[in-house]
Amino acid sequence: MAPPLPRTPTPTHPHSHAPPLPRTPTPAHPHSHAPPLPRTPTPTHPHSHAPPRSIQHRQGKDTKVNLYFPIDSKNPLSFLLGPTLKTRWCVVPVSFTFPLPDTDWLV
């Protein structure tokens, strides 16, 4: 009789003796042993471990640039609005009066 073939783990047989395959991290399995892929920062994930992009100035200095939240010294809210939006203030009357709930049943 031939020896059994090595099998990869399955949900019904998770204790297979075959070596596990390396997997890349996923949201459901973030602790994979495969090396993580380098990612560039995004607005939803600004703390990426990818190296920051840099630009070359005329003086020859290498400066880090934040591509997603540019800073404009003229407008203190530019980091919230982005490079293309302007700050617009508008006053809207809002009423905060609410009818009180019926408390007769508490007595």
Curated annotation (Swiss-Prot):
Protein's organism: Human herpesvirus 1 (strain F)
Repeat (Sequence) residue spans along the chain: 2-17, 18-33, 34-49
Region described as 3 X 17 AA tandem repeats: 2-49
Coiled coil region boundaries: none
Name used for this protein in its record: Latency-related protein 2
Organism phylogeny: Viruses, Duplodnaviria, Heunggongvirae, Peploviricota, Herviviricetes
Organism domain of life: Viruses
Chain positions covered by the region annotation Disordered: 1-63
Keywords per UniProt: Repeat
Biased composition (Basic residues): 46-58
Record field: compositional bias (Pro residues): 1-44
